């Protein structure tokens, strides 16, 4: 057996944090422990074999002894009675089982369609083109999500460290999602934890770094890690929800570069926890079967949901374009080979004043999207908005929504080692192939637009769908 414990006392935190943001925690600061079953059959599978091949969903955990959590001995009146929790779990799991069956049936229908060469007009908004791994299963899964998916946000903690995030600029997805679920009229907002499919830990990573770390005298992640870890300690002592699943139906969401480091302090505690991250680097611990890859999007003020058409394909005479700072090793290599060296592949570190960044993307067939300090880049979404085929230059990057989107049909991937051959690779793409990719860019970009309130198949819905898929891969057992 292994105990998951938090050892950092709250008295070590700055008084500002204690007074303003953790006023309730000192009443519930006993560290929780959970019993982790060492039976190999109960461990989360690392096998990539898919239950739904179109989604790359991984094998369900069905053993009744899995996720066996001991109840907290120090229960209070705020802790939900186990019998009531079991009834709620049973009801939710029955609904999820029905959803899985419906999605499987849709997948079988897709196989019959392929055999019979019939059309897929009944799929509706996701019917056209080949941007999806399986349009039928995606459409059915989205329908099931709208019917059954509910998110409960824990109420503990106060703004700005919790329940508040940026609504604009590079980390805006954190605040937009949080605001949609907490303050909007989202259909996915649970009325009570008993009807929740998943549980949202509303930690504001950006604001923690902004308010706790300034002035920046140290970039050590321990303060960030301790705040999140102690928050989990609080909610796991107060409620049974974390303990019954070992966090497998809990998630947090952040686009900040530091967000992946939250779990580094205690890998066992976060072993099953869903992390929704922009920095989806599989070489640095991002696990596609558990974690969610977020699109990185830069939202200017007053431009929410902004998409422009760009030039039609026949007017795009420039082969490829990139302009951006020398952030990280990938871009240094890009500049070494291509910076202001070719008239067909225009690469700038500092864009000349005579050029307009957006208009240059509008004129290019392909837009280079090299990694910066981390693997993700907002240029992928910017390319889609401009109708420019994104050229993703990154290794180990798990692309957003790759459970349902077939990125190969509307983007080009060039490994870092092949950067000297960028022009050769792009020129080898035929005009017909390019036109097909560009058409699919226009089709798929609806999934990368943020609307408030969220709309079916937009970016926020797609993020929720990614979380929904991870929840479909979990079966929570009833108490023994």
UniProtKB/Swiss-Prot annotation:
TM ranges: 5-25
Main location: Golgi
Localization per Swiss-Prot or TrEMBL: Golgi apparatus membrane
InterPro entries according to UniProt: Exostosin, Exostosin_GT47
Membrane side Cytoplasmic: residue ranges: 1-4
Membrane topology qualifier: Single-pass type II membrane protein
Topological domains, Lumenal: 26-480
Sugar-bearing residue positions: 68, 74, 119, 128, 243, 281, 356
Pfam family, one: Exostosin_GT47
Gene Ontology biological process terms in this record: cell wall organization; protein glycosylation
EC number: 2.4.-.-
Keyword annotations: Cell wall biogenesis/degradation, Glycoprotein, Glycosyltransferase, Golgi apparatus, Membrane, Signal-anchor, Transferase, Transmembrane, Transmembrane helix
Gene Ontology molecular function: any one: glycosyltransferase activity
A GO CC term assigned to this protein in UniProt: Golgi membrane
Similarity annotation: Belongs to the glycosyltransferase 47 family.
Protein purpose: May be involved in cell wall biosynthesis.
Protein name in UniProt: Probable glycosyltransferase At5g11130
Organism: Arabidopsis thaliana (Mouse-ear cress)
């Amino acid at each position: 057996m292994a105990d998951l414990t938090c050892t950092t006392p709250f008295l070590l935190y700055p008084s500002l944090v204690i007074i303003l943001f953790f006023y309730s925690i000192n009443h519930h600061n006993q560290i929780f422990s959970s019993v982790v079953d060492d039976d190999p059959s109960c461990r989360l599978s690392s096998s990539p074999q898919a239950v739904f091949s179109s989604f790359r969903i991984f094998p369900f955990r069905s053993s009744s002894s899995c996720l066996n959590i001991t109840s907290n001995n120090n229960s209070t009146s705020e802790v939900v009675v186990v019998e009531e929790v079991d009834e709620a779990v049973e009801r939710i799991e029955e609904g999820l089982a029905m959803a899985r069956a419906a999605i499987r049936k849709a997948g079988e229908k897709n196989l019959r369609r392929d055999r019979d060469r019939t059309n897929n007009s009944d799929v509706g908004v996701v019917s056209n083109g080949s941007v999806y791994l399986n349009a039928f299963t995606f459409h059915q899964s989205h329908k099931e999500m709208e019917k059954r998916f509910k998110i409960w946000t824990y109420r503990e903690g106060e703004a700005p460290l919790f329940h508040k995030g940026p609504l604009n600029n590079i980390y805006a997805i954190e605040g937009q999602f949080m605001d949609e679920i907490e303050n909007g009229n989202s259909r996915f907002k649970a009325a009570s934890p008993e009807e929740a499919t998943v549980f949202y830990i509303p930690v504001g990573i950006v604001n923690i770094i902004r308010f706790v770390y300034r002035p920046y005298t140290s970039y050590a992640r321990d303060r960030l890690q301790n705040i999140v870890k102690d928050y989990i300690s609080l909610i796991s002592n107060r409620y049974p929800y974390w303990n019954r699943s070992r966090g497998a139906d809990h998630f947090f969401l952040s686009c900040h570069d530091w967000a992946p480091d939250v779990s580094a302090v205690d890998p066992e505690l976060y072993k099953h926890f869903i992390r929704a991250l922009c920095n989806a680097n599989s070489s640095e611990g991002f696990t596609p079967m558990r974690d969610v890859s977020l699109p990185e999007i830069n939202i200017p003020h007053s431009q929410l949901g902004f998409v422009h058409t760009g030039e039609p394909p026949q007017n795009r005479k420039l082969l490829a374009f990139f302009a951006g700072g020398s952030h990280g090793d990938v871009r240094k290599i890009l500049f070494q080979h291509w910076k202001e060296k070719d008239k067909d592949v225009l690469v700038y570190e500092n864009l000349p004043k005579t050029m307009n960044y957006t208009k240059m993307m509008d004129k290019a067939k392909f837009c280079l999207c090299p990694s910066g300090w981390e693997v993700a880049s907002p240029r992928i979404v910017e390319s889609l908005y401009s109708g420019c085929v994104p050229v993703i230059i990154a290794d180990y990057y798990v692309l957003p929504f790759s459970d349902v989107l077939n990125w190969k049909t509307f983007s080009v991937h060039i490994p870092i080692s092949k950067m000297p051959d960028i022009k050769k690779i792009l020129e080898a793409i035929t005009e017909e192939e390019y036109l097909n990719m560009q058409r699919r860019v226009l089709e798929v970009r609806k999934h990368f637009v943020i609307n408030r309130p969220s709309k079916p198949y937009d970016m926020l819905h797609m993020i929720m769908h990614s979380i929904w898929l991870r929840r479909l891969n979990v079966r929570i057992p009833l108490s023994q």
